Amino acid sequence: MEKKQIINISIIIPVYKVEAYIERCIKSVATQEGIGSAYNLECILVDDCTPDRSMEIAKETIKQYENIHFICLRHEVNRGCSVARNTGLEYATGEYIMFIDSDDYVLPNCLKSFTDEIIKDPAIDMVIGSTIINNKTDIKERELLKGKESIIHGFLTMKYLITSWNKLVRKECITENKLLFIENIYLQDQPWLYYLASHIDSMLLLPNTTYSYEEAPESASHGVLNPEKAQRYVNSWNTVFEYYLSHRPNSKDFKHNLETDFLLYLQRTHLRAIMLFPYEKKDYNRILRFRDKIMSLALKDGRLIIACFLLLEYKPFIYLFKFKFIRSHYYYMVKTVGRIAHLFDFVHRKN
């Protein structure tokens, strides 16, 4: 009788100021279906010098479970989520990696759903499940993306959430490409996932609901920012945009031109940056410089459809986003513009 394949998984959880949530998070991991039969599990908790009782609660909680190998690591000083994840990666022994934010939790079927798919198709480099956000889920149908072109296209068109969590990733894809999170910035998931998408060959999107995202009341989307945080967000956006601009997809490598998707993604990301919360004038102007860089790229490449759409970020058109109708239909506007722009790409290639 053929021996059943057992997959080894490492889960990495940064811990900082989450005493109200950490027990729930750990229990959701420890009570996963299939531990020991479908896969072996280690869980790495990285204490990022948390000042509250988070680690005390975590250590009490893990005593209840012997079916998982828990590793507790500690930073001597607070270094941020990026470094905590990088630290976890150093110690991870699993063939596959999953990141979980400590104020979130995974549903009971999460890891078994992922590993069942990998056992059926070992070529899959990453499995992504559907996430509950505000009582809604994001992935509606199963889809296997094969080849870098399809995977990068999926990123740029946001077929899946631009996050590091709720994704089971082959560890080799991370370590062989020296893929670490950028330190000292917010939004660190964006460049990390973009680079990862450029270095894997097979990705599976699952409609199975596997992860619950809990938005913290103090998060940026609620507009609660002191001057220091605002400055850090501006620096973070600048880092992210510079990263994207220096890692443009080489369209010569693909059958279809990804430049249209790339420019529309930049425009959508930039619009979110300038509308997320009010900045001081000097910070706002720093972010606007990237709007002009995106416009320059579009014009230089002769993408007039994209350039016209980018005018929405300039006065007086930017004021249209004060209307709820425009905001709620913006996603569909992007898709429509993308289709039209791709049609012109096709005509151009034919000629």
Please state what every model-predicted region is:
Residues 82, 102-205, 213-228, 249:
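Donor-binding/catalytic cores of nucleotide-activated saccharide
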Residues 28, 47-56, 77:
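A conserved acidic beta->alpha catalytic loop
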Residues 97:
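Short aromatic/hydrophobic "clamp" motif used to bind/position activated sugar donors
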Residues 39-49, 71-75, 102:
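Short beta-strand/loop segment that forms part of the nucleotide-sugar
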Residues 1, 277-351:
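Membrane-interface aromatic/basic loop that binds lipid-linked glycans or pyrophosphate carriers
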Residues 75-92, 113:
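Glycine-rich, basic loop-to-helix element that forms the pyrophosphate-binding segment
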Residues 7-10, 42, 191:
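Cell-envelope/extracellular polymer assembly enzymes that use nucleotide-activated donors
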Residues 18-33:
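Short, well-formed alpha-helical segments that are part of the catalytic scaffolds
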